[in-house]
Amino acid sequence: MSVVSLLGVRVLNNPAAFTAPYEFEITFECLEQLQKDLEWKLTYVGSATSSEYDQELDSLLVGPIPVGVNKFIFEADPPDLKRIPTSEILGVTVILLTCSYDGREFVRVGYYVNNEYDSEELNKEPPTKPIIERVRRNVLAEKPRVTRFHIKWDTDSDPTEFPPVQPDADVLEDDGETYGAEELELEAALKRELEELDSQDADKMDVGEGRDDVDDNESDAGSEDLEGETSGSDDEEEEEGFEGEDEDVEMGDDSNPTPDQHQHPNPEVMVH
């Protein structure tokens, strides 16, 4: 739960000249006493193709903040034309109003801004070099894009550090040098065990040749009951196996996936 909630933002001077400062009336609610100030920023997106043209127009520290509903006026300078490509001055762009606590952004409000001339003639046939004195901006204040982020506040416990600290990672042996060594050792051990089992089976066959007739009679005597029991148990195991598979699929248990299962990590969604 967020300690600070943004209740509303009003764009006071809108529409306005391109060179006029931005003015916002911001209303927010604070649920508990904060140890530090809130930092508000206004960023102008100078180009849709590259973030290098983004400009931080102004920032403001607000505090100490009393518990309850608070309201203040945030005024920011217009963008620096020297940092905007000439082809990007006119048209639609974006401004971002953000608020952070202790360096952690928890709310972002995006507005579309339309920059155009104040006459139809100039808009139909714009001059090669923009006439800034005739350019007006119109912030689409009725359609803001609000994004909220979960952050750590004063009373929250520290989040689990990810990835975990691994102080011995640099002194460990390079995986590239030992890649596949363990598999080769297991394969060699398995071959040795199979060879030993083959030699033991050969010895047993030599000793047990004299008991073939007796073993055949004994096996024939109990074969009927054993087959019946075996077939019944096989059916039960088969039914149980299908029930288990249905349960795994239905419950979504991926702890023991079958070889033909393909696991697709959910993309992680990202809103801008």
Swiss-Prot record:
One of its GO terms (cellular component) is chromatin. InterPro entries: ASF1-like (IPR006818), ASF1-like_sf (IPR036747), Hist_deposition_Asf1 (IPR017282). This is Histone chaperone ASF1. Interacts with histone H3 and histone H4. GO terms for molecular function: histone binding. Histone chaperone that facilitates histone deposition and histone exchange and removal during nucleosome assembly and disassembly. GO terms for biological process: DNA replication-dependent chromatin assembly; nucleosome assembly; nucleosome disassembly. Residues 212-253 have a biased composition (Acidic residues). Residues 181-206 form a coiled coil. Belongs to the ASF1 family. It holds the Pfam family ASF1_hist_chap. The keyword Nucleus applies. Keywords: Chaperone, Chromatin regulator, Coiled coil, Nucleus, Transcription, Transcription regulation. It comes from Coccidioides immitis (strain RS) (Valley fever fungus). It is found in: Nucleus.
